[in-house]
């Protein structure tokens, strides 16, 4: 994913279908490990397509999810509160909130309890090293945890980065609040009606329409059914590689 070359913040119109916000979920048992090094440089990029997690605003509070949690990429952007439990030797007090930004692939050559941590049906979080060390000691390697879905709290609006080329508009959707995980997206040009976009990979959404020279609006729906419309966030002079900021969920 190319780095964002331009950031234009313009929230010209917004509408949400619900007003109560995302409620989250109950606590579930899982395990957690870490990857990416002490500076989390190895966590950049990833299967969600977010690229540089620092410039996208996610920082080091990130996790790669096992197959059981990743949901073929639909969980990208979801937020989880995690706490270490049942291990007095290695656990530290408190909890962390992380965003799903990557996939932890299975290793079927290893048993689930001896290296195949992300094998189905394991519920497992491979955390960035800095955030892992906030709930457990480095030497632990792997710890039992409890997790729950929580609302994502974001600064600013949802970001739409338009990549690709004519007739292949690939829109990366980031910085989504509320449930955080986009399950459907639509685009509307100033000379078109609303058109459904298909998920290409991660949180990259694709439209094969010719949208050049039109102002663009986006409609985003998250896993809890909340829908938000960002009207005319990209003006008619937009170009590929630019990022535009719209409305926000809570």
Curated annotation (Swiss-Prot):
Function statement: Causes loosening and extension of plant cell walls by disrupting non-covalent bonding between cellulose microfibrils and matrix glucans. No enzymatic activity has been found.
Disulfide-bonded cysteines: 48-76, 79-152, 84-91
Domain Expansin-like CBD, chain residue ranges per copy: 167-246
Domain of life: Eukaryota
InterPro entries, A to Z: Expan_Lol_pI (IPR007118), Expansin (IPR002963), Expansin/allergen_DPBB_dom (IPR007112), Expansin_CBD (IPR007117), Expansin_CBD_sf (IPR036749), RlpA-like_DPBB (IPR009009), RlpA-like_sf (IPR036908)
Organism: Arabidopsis thaliana
SMART domains: DPBB_1
Topological category with respect to the lipid bilayer: Peripheral membrane protein
PROSITE patterns, A to Z: EXPANSIN_CBD, EXPANSIN_EG45
Chief localisation class: secreted
GO cellular component entries: extracellular region; membrane
A single GO BP: anatomical structure morphogenesis
Protein name: Expansin-A1
Tissue-level expression: Expressed in stomatal guard cells and very young vascular bundles throughout the plant.
Family label: Belongs to the expansin family. Expansin A subfamily.
Domain Expansin-like EG45 intervals: 45-157
Annotated signal peptide: 1-17
Keywords associated with the record: Cell wall, Cell wall biogenesis/degradation, Disulfide bond, Membrane, Secreted, Signal
Localisation per UniProt entry: Secreted, Cell wall; Membrane
């Amino acid at each position: 994913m190319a780095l964002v070359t331009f950031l234009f913040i313009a929230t010209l119109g917004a509408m949400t279908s619900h007003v109560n916000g995302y409620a989250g979920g109950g606590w579930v048992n899982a395990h957690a490990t870490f990857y990416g090094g002490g500076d989390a440089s190895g966590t950049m990029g990833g299967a969600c397509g977010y690229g540089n997690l620092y410039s996208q605003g996610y920082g080091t509070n990130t996790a790669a999810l096992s197959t059981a949690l990743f949901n073929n990429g639909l969980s990208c952007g979801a937020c989880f509160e995690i706490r270490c439990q049942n291990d007095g030797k290695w656990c530290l007090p408190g909890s962390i909130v992380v965003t799903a930004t990557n996939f932890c692939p299975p290793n079927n050559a290893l048993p689930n309890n001896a290296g195949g941590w992300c094998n189905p049906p394991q519920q497992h979080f491979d955390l960035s090293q800095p955030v892992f060390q906030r709930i457990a000691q480095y030497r632990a390697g792997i710890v039992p945890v409890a997790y729950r879905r929580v609302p994502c709290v974001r600064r600013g609006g949802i970001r739409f980065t338009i990549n690709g080329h004519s007739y292949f508009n690939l829109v990366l959707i980031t910085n989504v609040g509320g449930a955080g995980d986009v399950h459907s997206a639509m685009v509307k040009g100033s000379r078109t009606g609303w058109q459904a976009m298909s998920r290409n990979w991660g949180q990259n959404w694709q439209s094969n329409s010719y949208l050049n020279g039109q102002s663009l609006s986006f409609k985003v729906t998250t896993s809890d059914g909340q829908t938000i419309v960002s009207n005319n966030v990209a003006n008619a002079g937009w170009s590929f590689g630019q990022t535009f900021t719209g409305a926000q969920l809570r």
